[in-house]
Amino acid sequence: MDQNINNVPAIEQVSINKIFGIPAGAQEILIAGRTAPAPYTPAIDPYYKFEMGHLRDVIAWLKVGMGEGLFLTGPTGAGKSSLVLQVAARLNLEVFNVTAHERLEFSDLVGQFVVKNGNMEYQYGPLALAMKRGGVFLLDEIDALPPGTNVGLNGAAEGRVLVIPENGGEVIKPHPEFRFAATGNTRGSGDDTGRYSGTIKQNLAFLDRFWCLEVGYLSKQKEEAILESVLPVPEMKGLIPKFLEVAEEVRRLFQSSDFTTQINTTISTRSLIRWVRLTHVFLSMAKRGCQPVYYALDRAILNKAAPEEKAAVKEIVQRIFGISEPEK
């Protein structure tokens, strides 16, 4: 990571009305941002569609200031990280993104000494850089965070100074625009469904430092608009409602509390786009006895699933599309 904090473009007040296309006539709202990307600004996904309620909440969180973390919870593939990344991308804010795991230590986030050109040099980690540069620290899969590490993050979530004893007692005073966001599938309360192995019940005092925003899958209307933008070809237009219906049914079973019908496979917006794109790519194979919808489905989603999961999803596809998979 670039350790230079002198190359950070200045943060100024920008209008969210213009950036996010809020209709004319609405009260103009200004928020901290930039007019051009900075080194760690995420790329804009031109096909991304915001749910206005989620966008409103993230904007409100950014405006509130330091000392209030944002915890986004929801099912796998709902777009929790993407929501933060795409808001930041349009505001040209920097994001320092880390995925938690059971071996993650506080020093991995703050920094450590490394050998550079034969000398020992202190290398700042993503948390320290976010605090110095006024970026968003985004900690994904917080449910997997070891208890000792989340205790170390209490101060950062509240916007307190960070002391680094290993670097001569350096004190980092957080930039006024530093923000701390986290994502997780289990609300930090542990997993009793068996879907999210490796998750750990999080410290209640740590979670108390965060707003909680529940993020579900995009609405069918939003996903339809995305698919039509990604693949605006006549031969696919009539099939898009069926792809969406399959995704909706698979997600319903994934989130079901009925263990007799529940499945452990879901379809994210990302994988839905992949499935539709691959189906279009493989359309020409239909003349050779290959069914492109099933062929693409395996490669986009189901080759990662257990055999019984594949069978369950393909039954849904057969019912909705009205086509059978050719025997192999």
Model regions: which residues?
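C-terminal regulatory/interaction module of P-loop NTP-utilizing enzymes
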Residues: 1-328
